[in-house]
């Protein structure tokens, strides 16, 4: 779908996809594309007021494009543009004598607006003079147009009360207990001058006693509007009381009985009034003479400024409003206009530049719901004869799109302001045409009907038979239903407004309406103003406001009517009577200002602050009342704003509304958009009463919820009012995010508390926004759930959790968080204390981290070993922390339930320390994990330890693997008898801890027996035996460890300097000897690895830049507990790596030398190929059968390096 938006002579084609975007979005896209065509002028400025059809109808910015525009349609942009630093003409030809917007210029202009009538001339056209509409000339300082020149002084003006509200006693019209509609009609009819009414009627006084009058009466319908004006005397019986006394004549109309107007009363109500009056001794009837009937029908519409007060608004005491609890419906009222004839000017100059109109077929018909039916059932047939004059028949027709059954029915679209239809007054918008001059038009196309009508010559009469739908939209009556009103009598004020229509062209009144409907019963409760459209008559008048309830139009009450009937009444008045006079009279109900006491109770705005705000608002209204009602404008430099302006009329009692300001100030005042984002709307094509359900009317106008594009906004009337009271206290105040409410080391508890407080603030039921929970409220939670964090990283992650949860709440908090809530203040204070505690703990954690880093830097370990240890430690940590899940889950539940207590903080602190200590212990165990190795000695098969056959054997190797010494080349220490060294700090692990570790791998724990002196006992011999068994097992599996080709140096079985033992996992091992852990860690538990992995590895790939192990010492020694010197051992010479490390003197040994493993072969021997390795048998004893020993000594042995 594509739409062309015309900026003067420039057409901008805007692709709209499937047309599901709003008119407002189309306007923005068109503006952006138009500005791109003016890139050569960086100072060029454009402001779009609204979009129009080519025949003049204004598009509502809230409408969905596909519902109001067809594919490839043309729309006209009404806009202001400004060339940089020069005078230009806008497309309509009006001089745009101002430069691009400037804040200082606007401020100065606003101050001068009240004194200088800059450019406020009134355009007078011949059609305005012909129409007879009096020309009202005023100074720009006058607040409103003066009274009608021909208007007779009203009772209010005669009594000198022209500027005061006219308060009518509501008890004077309650002689009967009929519906309030009659009372309202009486109030409206009393507005007309008595002298004018007495000229057209005669008073007849009769006695209530005696014989019946003997008259036959029927409803008196107006020929102009179809309204019921009274009782029409159709006949008089012979020899009746009326005939004898000459009281009445046929064709006379009774319009008033005992000061009770019969205007808009149903026939039954009028009869009842008559019967009640006849029970009194004297009855006064006002009878309308036949010759004055037409004049009376026009006078019902109402003269200009019937009260003569300057603001043209009467304030009467709360007439009965429509009933109400919401469930609203909306109808967009814009009239499509007449294609011909000049339009008369009005007293107010149009602020929008006039743009050229292009001829266009009607694409947006404005019809009644009859178009949606097309059936003649329940329709009343009316025959109407129209005499074609020089101005034509004066109406337009429209039809549906063609269907499979042929052309659709043809309807009357609009009644033009000139022509035979408006003079006759019976034809209405929405009537279905059945016959023309006796010929049935059913099944004929619109073109054929138009040709038939145009074939009528001037002076001839066209006979039409039309069908008018009646009664099908009335709601069913519920007996005993209590009357509930949307605006109560005490809390609303009634205003009568006369709004000129002529200068708005075909834009009409320019309002979008919404219908209120009871949710419980479905009863219609009245129509309200949804929004004021820029460029329309209501916008230029500036007195109508959003959420005003319409109770009467042109003197015709809307009370008691269904929403559909009220819409039709308003449309009819717009299309016929309003165009005759160029003026429309509206009676509205408006919610008055809220008392200051009620506002001050809300706590956020004190009385002095409110009075200052009220004073500022009244000043701004005095200068420009339309600032509250602009619909929306666009400027490339300005972003659209949503301004919360109070529409309650706080200062309205003292300051009458003023006319709109000069166009030069318009840009600054209209850059604020009234957001109507409290409705979720359903749109339908054209105007066959496009009802849309919106939110309740009971909310005040300054509630400005964010517009939601989702459909999850379901209004909750119970919450709206309370929320409105809380929000209304500071209409212009911005609520900032209260980030302090979400800072806590226990995020779950605070987030839950805040969510509980806030969920009652939302005025609608919607799926709760995703509450961003932290990755964990504390370390215990993370320890139980998330195993990927280390200690110090957990603190950082907590900080990130705080940030993420804060950002998740910001949008909701801006809308609904109340200010000054004492409960939330307490939460915030507690949160700050918790934050301080947490920061201290973070500092401690960072200190521990630095100590660890220092130790790690001192140790020359390769990156591969660190990665393995970290991953292995995480696995162990997972198993270890598994035991504490139950306690931590309970802890988490306690945190969620409320605010953190002091005991909980202590628990959290202890938990953190405990986890840190265990984590460090596990890291140390990884570093000093007990290594298994094998020596090359054969042994019997039956000596194999049954650990290897145990299916539950976990093969966990590195519980006690030590970190490398800071210096491998330290001078040897003398052998010192003593207990075996455990970790590097010398602390032996607790038996309970070791038993827990053994339980993880399903192995029994056999603690070593220690003598009182700490020396190893007989268990050492057992460990040596098991070590020998493992060595034999390795030999049987084909491993020759560090063998030379010719010799094999083997340790003495009784050499006590070699001490073997059984580790926690059940494997035999050599306890820690200084500097030997690298070789030990490289020894396999059994099983061969894939040789290909080792053939393809680089020689130094497994060392990762760490130093190669170098063991020049002749014999191994125990790990010393002190720094005692070690006795030299000269039994062996150093044969390892002779080309790199020449053998040092015997007395300069720097480290232990393994007796059980012979030196590695020289470097020059070749590395065998894969085929040779594959041929090596598992039990071959020849050195050539084990090619893996022929390798670069700098490369770790591939068969022993696997962990």
Curated annotation (Swiss-Prot):
InterPro entries: PAR3, Par3/HAL_N, PDZ, PDZ_sf
Keywords: Cell cycle, Cell division, Cell junction, Membrane, Phosphoprotein, Repeat, Tight junction
Record keyword Ion transport present: no
UniProt region (Disordered), positions on chain: 79-104, 138-162, 334-374, 718-743, 787-927, 968-994, 1050-1203
One GO BP: cell division
Compositionally biased spans, kind Basic and acidic residues: 718-732, 827-842, 855-865, 881-893, 906-927, 984-994
Residues the record lists as Phosphoserine modifications: 100, 346, 352, 368, 635, 710, 728, 730, 746, 749, 801, 1088, 1182
Repeat listed as a keyword: yes
Localization in the cell: Endomembrane system; Cell junction; Cell junction, Tight junction
Polar residues: bias regions: 152-162
Entry's Gene Ontology cellular component terms: bicellular tight junction; endomembrane system; membrane; protein-containing complex
PROSITE patterns: PDZ (PS50106)
Main location: membrane
SMART domains, A to Z: PDZ
Modified residues (Phosphothreonine): 810
Pfam families (alphabetical): Par3_HAL_N_term (PF12053), PDZ (PF00595)
Domain PDZ positions: 201-289, 383-468, 496-585
Residue ranges with Basic residues bias: 843-854
Annotated SUPFAM superfamilies: PDZ domain-like
Cleaved signal peptide residues: none
Function: Putative adapter protein involved in asymmetrical cell division and cell polarization processes. May play a role in the formation of epithelial tight junctions.
Family listed: Belongs to the PAR3 family.
The protein's assembly and partners: Interacts with PARD6B. Interacts with INSC/inscuteable.
Protein's UniProt name: Partitioning defective 3 homolog B
Organism: Mus musculus
